[in-house]
């Protein structure tokens, strides 16, 4: 029942969607649900969904773990910055879409400034226990290959939260259905605009 109350009607979604004239950019830790919630938001708003990590892999012609292994994190971050800049567009080309970013993207000062200037940044947050459980489902996280995932996630979360906190919208991704999280994000954006 409480989930039903959190959902928006299609007319509310349409009204909010008309007010959003730029990309919605999901930022936050790996495993928080940016891609899944982003797809749901894009579906609700009838706009394209773009996963920055997929675009980086397409541009580099190799998967992200291979980029990290072959060239290192600084090289990856440089490519990530360029790809996100392209995806954000410029001037009138800053179109409506939902963009999911990698966990470290918003920590880069140039990328963060670009997102804050041209988009609406939404910090999707979760507790470490949830992150550990979710990232354990996949074996494609280069930053977790070097030690205990819980310790690494705790450290990364502590390091990155001051950057994520600069996003104007902050939403916790918990056990509720993704549709509920997406509706809550749209309500928060509606109040912020």
Curated annotation (Swiss-Prot):
Binds 1 Mg(2+) ion per subunit. The keyword Magnesium applies. It is found in: Cytoplasm. GO terms for molecular function: ATP binding; magnesium ion binding; shikimate kinase activity. The keyword Cell wall biogenesis/degradation does not apply. Its EC number is 2.7.1.71. GO terms for biological process: amino acid biosynthetic process; aromatic amino acid family biosynthetic process; chorismate biosynthetic process. Pathway: Metabolic intermediate biosynthesis; chorismate biosynthesis; chorismate from D-erythrose 4-phosphate and phosphoenolpyruvate: step 5/7. Its cofactor is Mg(2+). Mg(2+) binds at residue 35. Pfam families: SKI. This is Shikimate kinase.
